[in-house]
Design a protein with these regions (language model features):
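Cell-envelope/glycan interface and biosynthesis
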Residues: 1-141
Length: 141
């Protein structure tokens, strides 16, 4: 709804949302012991909000159904995906100003819808905190 008010021909695309803990364990086994472990929630510590169905990996499609450029692909496990360093990323040529503006648009519409961005992943948004999820919701096995 928020996106349609600003850009009627744009759409959101969901890449990942609810994730069973069984899948989380497989993902963790791929990254544990590597430099990429920090990008995947450890299932031994309760997993993440995807495991409660309370997180979404999302982007924006233009009027032709093409994803807007965001500087990296979804699930890029690296510094360029970070939202807190976007000015530096533009300054050093890692992402363009247009890509930064597209990220800002995504954050704007998702925040208006009640979601919070994850600083290390421009595509990831949480609906609530992990503590709130643990109190109110059940894990997806």
């Amino acid at each position: 709804k928020e996106l349609k008010q600003l850009y009627p021909s744009y759409n959101l695309i969901v890449y990942d949302a609810a994730r069973p803990m069984s899948v989380q364990k497989k993902m963790w086994n791929v990254v544990k012991g590597t430099s990429k472990f920090k990008y995947v929630s450890n299932p031994n510590h309760g997993g993440g909000l995807h495991n409660y169905g309370l997180a979404v990996d999302i982007s924006i499609l233009d009027s032709l159904g093409t994803p807007l450029p965001m500087g990296t692909k979804v699930d890029h496990l690296g510094f360029e995906a970070n939202i807190t360093q976007e000015n530096e990323l533009v300054h050093t040529g890692k992402i363009s100003e247009n890509e930064r503006q597209n990220r800002i648009l995504l954050r704007t519409v998702m925040k208006k819808a009640g979601f919070r961005p994850l600083p290390s992943e421009w595509w990831h948004f949480n609906f609530c905190s992990r503590d709130e999820a643990k109190r109110k919701y059940k894990l997806i096995p």
